[in-house]
Amino acid sequence: MIRKSKKITKMRGSRTCGYGEAKKHRGAGHRGGRGNAGHQKHKWLSVCKFNPDYFGKYGFNRNPGLIKQLETINIGELEEYILKYKDAFQVEDGKVVVDATEIGYEKVLGKGRISTAMVVKAVEFSEGAKEKIEAAGGEFVEL
């Protein structure tokens, strides 16, 4: 709704223009500081009541050296890779032999579809990848 007169025009003569006492509109003194100021001083009780876990440390950060991160490839992507570079792979008993570690991958995951019978060698396989490789007439070899 459009107002004909601005707020300041309405407030003329009221001295505080809607801010209560004259001192209340100056800086942040009326609020006890801006934002989180005073949370360990004069606002401590409200912190204890409404946000008791705000201060202090919780949990731990795991040592990055202990985390095992494997380079992964999905079985569908692996088949695309084989079809793209056919000449680079050996064929034994009608199955393409693929060593995933030679192309920079350690774990084979099960996303995607495959129709090529292949012998896949890798450090690890997901359950889905194992099922799909065997369903296509291939086999997997864990290194």
From Swiss-Prot:
Which region ranges are annotated with the description Disordered? 1-38
Top-level taxonomic group: Archaea
Record field: compositional bias (Basic residues): 1-13, 23-38
* Keyword Ribosomal protein set for record: yes
- A Pfam entry, by short name: Ribosomal_L27A
Report the record's disulfide bonds: none
One GO cellular component term of this record is: cytosolic large ribosomal subunit
How it assembles, according to the record, is: Part of the 50S ribosomal subunit.
- Homology family: Belongs to the universal ribosomal protein uL15 family.
Output this protein's name.
Large ribosomal subunit protein uL15
**Its gene?**
rpl15
